[in-house]
């Protein structure tokens, strides 16, 4: 006999379930489903949602560089205080150079351990505690972009990374204002903290910069998008017609060769035949010498070279024993206390002073002076 569970259902038993389901509207736009209404926030996860806590304890650990040791040691009490509010333990191991976070029996939020892991990762990547602690908020996320392996050449990598920062950090500041994210460029990574929409744009700009696309192009398009988002009508439309289209220009610079060969002037005559070894020996007279004479001559030339090299080496050794030239001793000049008195010049000055009369001139002296002046004028005429 068949069991009641294996019996077939009656006809029309399941039709009522399909009848109750509402048909999906065919003309409904996908953009309306994807858009989030203004002012909507995700409800916070409280202890009432999970009163019994977590079943198992979870932990994450990360290493940090040596230069961050002093800063982490200083701000670690603040890190522990921030994590204790969410019932998460944090330990700093200076010997191993690692940071560890783990849940406790009081932890009620299952996702807080992931946020705590991101916190210690950001602290290891030279992000300040004031910025890194924001990751514990619900509406804030982080992204650590690895850029070290995107460019092979070290010099080219440094140049493109500096292009991302900009002169005096102006490009990075503009990107932070447009995306509402905090961005930190350190070594081979770029750390960003902010909303999800901003992090998506930051990742795109960073990767494009490493692919030799200047960040100013992406910043320009972000500025246009920011203005378009303010318009409620254009929010649900495609923005491709408003965004600028940049053409890629591949300029191939022809590299000059290291060795430049200069062509000689054309001559109809062939080049002169080079002299052979026999011709050289005939010219010097060595060709007619005997074998033992040639050998003796060769040995004499070698000995002469050796003697010259020994003499040069000896001169260089003797240079260390030659004393340096002493500077001539300059005796300090004694200041002469006696001053020479010129008696003759003093006498002349006294005579001139005696001849001079003090006070106004007399009437006779004035008349004589006027006559002398008139005579001088007549002579000039």
Curated annotation (Swiss-Prot):
Boundaries of every KH domain copy: 154-206
Biased composition, class Basic and acidic residues, residue ranges: 7-27, 39-51
InterPro entries tied to this protein: KH_dom (IPR004087), KH_dom_type_1_sf (IPR036612), KRR1-like_KH1 (IPR041174), KRR1-like_KH1_euk (IPR048550), KRR1-like_KH2 (IPR048548), KRR1-like_KH2_euk (IPR048549), rRNA_assembly_KRR1 (IPR024166)
Main location: nucleus
GO cellular component: chromosome; cytoplasm; intercellular bridge; membrane; nucleolus; nucleoplasm; small-subunit processome
Region (Disordered): 1-51, 250-278, 309-338
A single GO molecular function term of this UniProt record: RNA binding
CDD domains: KH-I_KRR1_rpt1, KH-I_KRR1_rpt2
Alphabetical list of SMART domains matching this protein: KH
Locations listed in the record: Nucleus, Nucleolus; Nucleus; Cytoplasm
Span of the signal peptide: none
Covalent link Glycyl lysine isopeptide (Lys-Gly) (interchain with G-Cter in SUMO2), residues: 24, 340, 369
Gene Ontology BP, a term: ribosomal small subunit biogenesis
N-acetylalanine carried by residues: 2
Feature: compositional bias, Basic residues: 250-262
Subunit structure: Part of the small subunit (SSU) processome, composed of more than 70 proteins and the RNA chaperone small nucleolar RNA (snoRNA) U3. (Microbial infection) Directly interacts with HIV-1 protein VPR. Also identified in a complex with NR3C1 and HIV-1 protein VPR.
Family named by the database record: Belongs to the KRR1 family.
Listed name of the protein: KRR1 small subunit processome component homolog
